[in-house]
């Protein structure tokens, strides 16, 4: 689960992290009032969407030369004008795709006198089972370019969660950022505070970009992006309350209500599979046969007829879907139950696109018999390769 920047900063502040003063705003008037509560004389008006690259982003509705989603304002009138420009408009960034995201809230913060910018992030390294703290002296909006052009400028400090954060980890961060004296001590302390926040709230990713040194010698978290492990949210009702469903795909929200793992993609073949690994293999083989998956959808190991019906409805809610491939390997899950769900779903949604089904595993013959006797135009497949070839052929035939 993702949260907005202003929420991330409020959370980090509870762990002692230094952040600029700021207030969220839902209207232009609220943005003006937020600015009046801050000392100024410079304010920063920030679009709040669940995507990075806001500073270099562009608003669809504004002229091409208009500023992006992070703007300096030198007067209250500029705050008002910038807020009016952003609210209700669609911000397109490197992370949103061409569709962009509508800006429904802003974050007005105090300006900072910046001397230097740095980069610091933390994430779970699943390969090693450790926490990776990634730092660079090249902070700011172009960290992706730094990673591409000069990867040697990015350092990784690995922390074993069983050992926890130790002083030498903090010193390694400060050394990598080339900080000395009091700034070195601040960096050591900040690294520990961020680690504590990361662990205590079950974050999966924390990105500070930029971390700045101000002209008066202070380290300040100027921007923060946070994601949480959704599987751990039951332990954090306070964090779950921060969820902004307007930033999420409605189909993904509906899928979560049925305990379905659904991610919308840009292709035209809808996929319903049990197991993440099999789902990824299914998507790969669709691409191998010349078309692209419209989604990742894992129904899990305990799918019921109702769950399968919901999965079909979610897949077909995407108007780009031109065909559906169901690929089920029934171990815990019974193929006859899946077949019943497929038949019920196809009838309920009045299926109008080609459907190819590959079943294997527990009660597979009963499942195949149910599909064959359903009277529905369901194409059966014997294996994964056969299924991919058939769905591509059926979609092309229907075009």
Swiss-Prot record:
InterPro entries named in the record: ATP-grasp, ATP-grasp_succ-CoA_synth-type, ATP_grasp_subdomain_1, SUCC_ACL_C, Succ_CoA_ligase-like_bsu, Succinyl-CoA_synth-like
Obligatory cofactor(s): Mg(2+)
GO cellular component: cytosol; succinate-CoA ligase complex
One GO biological process term: tricarboxylic acid cycle
Cystine bridges: none
Residues the record lists as binding ATP: 46, 53-55, 112, 117
Molecular function (Gene Ontology), one example: ATP binding
Binding of substrate, residues: 274, 331-333
Family label: Belongs to the succinate/malate CoA ligase beta subunit family.
Function description: Succinyl-CoA synthetase functions in the citric acid cycle (TCA), coupling the hydrolysis of succinyl-CoA to the synthesis of either ATP or GTP and thus represents the only step of substrate-level phosphorylation in the TCA. The beta subunit provides nucleotide specificity of the enzyme and binds the substrate succinate, while the binding sites for coenzyme A and phosphate are found in the alpha subunit.
This protein's name: Succinate--CoA ligase [ADP-forming] subunit beta
Organism: Rhizorhabdus wittichii (strain DSM 6014 / CCUG 31198 / JCM 15750 / NBRC 105917 / EY 4224 / RW1) (Sphingomonas wittichii)
């Amino acid at each position: 689960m993702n949260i907005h920047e202003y929420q991330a900063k409020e959370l980090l502040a509870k762990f002692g992290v230094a952040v600029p003063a700021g207030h969220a705003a839902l209207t232009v008037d609220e943005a003006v009032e937020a600015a009046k509560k801050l000392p100024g004389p410079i304010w920063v008006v920030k679009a709040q969407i669940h995507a990075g690259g806001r500073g270099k982003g562009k608003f669809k509705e504004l002229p091409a030369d208009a500023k992006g989603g992070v703007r300096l304002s030198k007067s209250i009138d500029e705050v008002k004008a910038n807020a009016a420009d952003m609210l209700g408009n669609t911000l397109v960034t490197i992370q949103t795709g061409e569709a962009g995201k509508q800006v429904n809230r802003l974050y007005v913060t105090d300006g900072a006198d910046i001397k230097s910018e740095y980069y610091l992030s933390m994430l779970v390294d699943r390969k090693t089972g450790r926490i990776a703290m990634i730092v660079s002296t090249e902070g700011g909006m172009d960290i992706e370019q730094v990673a591409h052009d000069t990867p040697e400028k990015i350092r990784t400090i690995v922390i074993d969660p069983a050992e926890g954060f130790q002083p030498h980890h903090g010193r390694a961060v400060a050394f990598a950022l080339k900080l000395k004296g009091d700034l070195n001590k601040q960096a050591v302390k900040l690294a520990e505070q961020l680690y504590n926040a990361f662990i205590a709230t079950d974050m999966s990713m924390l990105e500070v970009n930029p971390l700045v040194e101000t002209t008066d010698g202070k380290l300040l978290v100027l921007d923060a992006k946070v994601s949480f492990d959704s599987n751990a949210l039951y332990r954090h009702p306070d964090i779950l309350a921060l969820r902004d469903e307007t930033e999420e795909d409605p189909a993904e929200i509906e899928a979560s209500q049925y305990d379905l793992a659904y991610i919308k993609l840009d292709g035209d073949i809808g996929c319903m599979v049990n197991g993440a690994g099999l789902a990824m293999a299914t998507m790969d083989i669709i691409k191998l046969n010349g078309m692209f998956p419209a989604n990742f959808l894992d129904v899990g190991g305990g799918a019921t007829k109702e769950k399968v019906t919901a999965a079909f409805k979610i897949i077909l809610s995407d108007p780009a879907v031109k065909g559906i491939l169901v690929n089920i390997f029934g171990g815990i899950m019974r193929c006859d139950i899946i077949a019943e769900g497929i038949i019920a779903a196809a009838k309920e949604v009045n299926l109008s696109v080609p459907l190819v089904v590959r079943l294997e595993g527990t009660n597979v013959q009963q499942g195949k018999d149910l599909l064959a006797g359903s009277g529905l135009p369901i194409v059966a497949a014997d294996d994964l390769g056969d299924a991919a070839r058939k769905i591509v052929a059926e979609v092309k035939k229907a075009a």
